[in-house]
């Protein structure tokens, strides 16, 4: 698989993309894929051949990961890929790590059975294996911005991994209490969490600026350190998530030749992974972006105009409180010629739009790119009030507890009329409700969280190990302290 930067087409191996995280020109690395799926195509047949009967039991997730990694990380040795899969399975004791359960007309793709109760646990169990391989013995300092879930999953993934150190930057007042405790209680010497007086966009902008700063990278190198990322800007985080949607297709294969998927979206990585799965042969018909009132992504899928504006609202779905979503850049590249093999044209268009975002605060897709966007994507939004109402509705209708992010997706799906035409509608259930007790109490007026997942109940009794808080303009110094 060939990877190039979205900005200038600079080529890299998959191992290099994992090690670097961000491309030297400030762009993101993208696999050069084609829009290949159609019923009966060679790639669809290959996927069907590997899916067995669609009910893979305990091996389902592992087989889906092997399928994806053999396509997208094919130049990483098979022994390394298999070690990553084995590490993943060792950290997911459930009989079926990613089940699909039917609730109230929807197919709930449960991605929250890892240690921190969020969809990021899968990929962040595997990333350290790829990172160590790519580093080749070099020391790596992993910088990560988080709106809540990535931070704790990354800290759990890298805890105790030789040759690596990780620091996560999170909004000091913009996460749930459980999310915050999951980041501030780990005592491992190589993991660090820093609260910032700002929001996720501030943290992400600072981290990306550090990656693109030659002086900062040279300073790190003088201490024998290479900087990398555990955010979904890193292919090693993004690629394992593709398997979720390969697996969903396998599990639904006996019921339907197609499915739609609705994903609560913040930084656009999870739904981009679903798009990659479609390009690899998963029979996804429509990809639905579900936003909260910070609805930049939903508006983008409706208009082809990306306009973050100045409005930012702290909501009850904090992991989606994002205005500038990094992974959209990868989609821009694909719909601007990348899917058709016009790498130079795609890079020129992407560089133009990202430049306009920097200078003008917005950009607009070309007419052709809009056509491709609208063909595959749809979007909708839900208010905090609608989110809590949907949590109550699903609990009353199906006895099923939604976390607020999944409730946004469920609400958007219903508002848009899914399921449609007899085609199953898959909702990406991205977190357990137990991560958001304050919202659950407000939604239900009583404590409905009676059976917490392992490790959650004792969080409040653990000592706080990570106490540092800083201003946004102090993030660079916080990184330097780890050199």
Residue ranges of predicted features:
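PLP-dependent amino-acid enzyme catalytic core
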Residues: 1-483
